[in-house]
């Protein structure tokens, strides 16, 4: 298991109350493959540095998890297929 941090920028037209339940469906991919979700931090609506898909704002979510590389790539693939996800960034957070 490796530690990862995933930043997800969601469509700002979403209701912020529905963000956590909709993310749970994606995070179940990690749990099903034996990984663990350490922390889900919903930052809320923030201004983007530049427009993405004609949106000047986005709902930021940061997820800390431990999983296998194949599981994380599958999670990233599923997030990118979702229309409400504007952008994702996956980083390995090895602590040296």
UniProtKB/Swiss-Prot annotation:
Single GO MF annotation: small ribosomal subunit rRNA binding
One biological process term from GO is:
translation
GO-annotated cellular components: cytoplasm; ribonucleoprotein complex; ribosome
Q: Tell me the domain of life.
A: Bacteria
Q: Which CDD domains match?
A: bS6 (cd00473)
Which Pfam families did the record assign? Answer: Ribosomal_S6 (PF01250)
* Keyword Transmembrane listed: no
Keyword annotations for this protein, in alphabetical order, are: Ribonucleoprotein, Ribosomal protein, RNA-binding, rRNA-binding
Q: State the similarity comment.
A: Belongs to the bacterial ribosomal protein bS6 family.
Protein's job: Binds together with bS18 to 16S ribosomal RNA.
Q: What is this protein called?
A: Small ribosomal subunit protein bS6
Q: Which organism is it from?
A: Mycolicibacterium paratuberculosis (strain ATCC BAA-968 / K-10)
Tell me the gene name: rpsF
């Amino acid at each position: 298991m490796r530690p990862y941090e995933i930043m997800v920028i969601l469509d700002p037209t979403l209701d912020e109350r529905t963000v956590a339940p909709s993310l749970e469906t994606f995070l179940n991919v990690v749990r099903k493959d034996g990984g663990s979700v350490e922390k889900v931090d919903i930052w809320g609506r923030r201004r983007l540095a530049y427009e993405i898909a004609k949106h000047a704002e986005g709902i930021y979510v940061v997820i800390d998890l431990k999983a296998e590389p194949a599981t994380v790539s599958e999670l990233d693939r599923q997030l990118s297929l979702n229309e409400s996800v504007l952008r994702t960034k996956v980083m390995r957070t090895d602590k040296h």
